[in-house]
Amino acid sequence: MGMHAKKPGKILADLVSVLPDDQLMIGREASPSGNGSCHVFRMLVRVGYHETDGQRRVHHANYLNYFEKSRVEMLRAAGFDYRGFEKEGLMLVISELKIRYRGAAEFDDLLRISTWVTDVRGARIVHRHEVDREGELLVECDLVCGCIDERGRVRRLPKEWVKCFAPDRAENSYSQASRDGQGDT
């Protein structure tokens, strides 16, 4: 079906949409980082025993798997098909990653993974991921993906993605101007 499973942005048009299993949610809200508004995707993950290390805590590398799943599911919830994206000869590769571990998750914990786009333009898309357990922030991650073709050449992201995931730039500009003392008080 190409790059899109359904009409782009259809789900994002709703204030909050809950998918059938009540575990995946997406909606437009104030940016958790405080800059304007954006689409925030949330999913729940139960920590499996195989995801833990010798101390029964989630091995640090497994958070990357949670983030990957969250990014793919966010695309799906927004009406985009990553498999179709790859069939068109495009793919996303991680070019930059910054993680801060604030606490440890353990076997059988129920975690909420929150994902949103903080910037999207040209060939890059920047995601913010946060993991919390019952409101306690455990992990923060800023992740930059670049769009390339099968030969590794840089390619622009689909316009539909940019339009769908771009943070509310007007609101972001206003927020920045206010912090710089240039906006209305």
Predicted features along the sequence, with ranges:
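Generic structural detector for well-ordered beta-strands
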Residues: 42-48, 100
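N-terminal first-folded block
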Residues: 52-102
